[in-house]
Amino acid sequence: MSVLLGQILDALGGELVGGDREMPISRIAPLDSAGAGDLSFLSNPRYRQQLAASEAACVIVAPAMRELAQQRGACIVVPDPYAYFARATQWWKRNCRSVAPAGIHPSAVVHESAIVDASATIGPLCVVEEGATIGAHTVLKSRVTIGENCHVGARCLLHSGVVLGADGFGFAPENGAWVKIEQLGGVRIGDDVEIGANTCIDRGALDDTVIEDGVKLDNLIQIGHNVHVGKHTAMAGCVGVAGSARIGAHCTVGGGAIVLGHLQLADRVHISAATVVTRSLTQSGVYTGMFPVDENAKWEKNAATLKQLHSMRDRIKALERQLQQSADQGHNGTQ
C-alpha cells in the first residue's frame, strides 16, 4: 500500500522542499536501507554521510540539514525530525495497517464486576479480574492479566504477557519460616501508559502501586509492591525496581538497572544501563554505577585491586603525612 506525500504533510505539517506532494510513499524506512518510494528521517547530524548516500524518496530533516538534504533530493524540514518521525509512524499505523476493533475477544475472561470501556480492546486469552477497570481506547494485547481491583487509565497499551496485580513479595520471618503478608492494595495505571511484553507490576501491600500518566515501560521489567513511578518516566528492558521505591517524573532508567527498595529518585534523574542504585538520589542529573567491561584477565586484576582500595587509601594518607613531616623538618632546618 502507498500514500501520497501530501497526505502526510496535510496531517503532520512541515515544509516540503524540492519535492512533489503527489509523490507516492510506500513505507517509512531507515536512511541506510531506504529506497525509491520510502520516507526516511535524519535526527542526528552524526549520520549526515548516510543522508548523502540515501536513496529515500524524501527525508525528514532539521533546518540545519536543509541545504545538505536539498542537494540530495526532496526533504521535509521541521524543528524536531525525531518527533515528526514518531508521529509519522502513528499516522501510518492508523491509516495503512489494520487495527483490532474495540471490544472483548471471545477467548478473553472478564469478571462480571469489571468495568471495561466500550472503546477499549481486550485481546485473545486476556483475563480481567473482579473489580478491575479498563479506560477508554486502551488496548490489551493477548494474554494480559489484570488482577482484582487494579485500574488502567485511558489510551494505554499493554503488550502480550503483562501481569498487573500479582502479589507483592512480602513475608515475615517467624521461627525459621516465612509468614505470608497478604497484599491488600491494588495497582493504578494512569493515562497514556505503555507497558512492554512480560512486564510485571505487583499490587501494593496496603496502598496501591502507582504508575502515573505517560510512563513508558519496556519488556521484562519488574515493579515491586508499593512502588510509585512519576509522570513520563521511561524504563528500558529488564529493569528491576524493588518495593516501596519512589521514582520521580521525567526520569529514565537504562536497561538492566536495579533500584533498591525504599529509595527515592528526584524528578529528571537519569540512570545508566546496568547501574545498581543503592541510595536515594535527591538531585536531577545522570548517574552511573557499574564496573566497565574488559578482558577477563584485566578485569580480575582490577577487581582484586578494588578490594584493596580502603587499605591503599590509608597507606597513601600515611605516606602523605610522612612527606609533609619531612618537608616541615627540612624547612625548619634551613631557617
From Swiss-Prot:
Keyword Lipid biosynthesis: yes
Domain of life: Bacteria
Functional description taken from the UniProt entry: Catalyzes the N-acylation of UDP-3-O-acylglucosamine using 3-hydroxyacyl-ACP as the acyl donor. Is involved in the biosynthesis of lipid A, a phosphorylated glycolipid that anchors the lipopolysaccharide to the outer membrane of the cell.
Pathway where this protein functions: Bacterial outer membrane biogenesis; LPS lipid A biosynthesis
Key words of the record: Acyltransferase, Lipid A biosynthesis, Lipid biosynthesis, Lipid metabolism, Repeat, Transferase
A Pfam family: Hexapep_2
One GO BP: lipid A biosynthetic process
Catalytic activity: a UDP-3-O-[(3R)-3-hydroxyacyl]-alpha-D-glucosamine + a (3R)-hydroxyacyl-[ACP] = a UDP-2-N,3-O-bis[(3R)-3-hydroxyacyl]-alpha-D-glucosamine + holo-[ACP] + H(+)
Recorded GO MF terms: N-acyltransferase activity
Oligomeric form and interacting partners: Homotrimer.
Protein name, UniProt field: UDP-3-O-acylglucosamine N-acyltransferase
Classification via PROSITE patterns: HEXAPEP_TRANSFERASES
UniProt key word Repeat: yes
GO cellular component: a single term: membrane
Gene transcribed to yield this protein: lpxD
EC numbers on record: 2.3.1.191
InterPro entries, alphabetized: Hexapep, Hexapep_transf_CS, LpxD, Trimer_LpxA-like_sf, UDP_GlcNAc_AcTrfase_non-rep
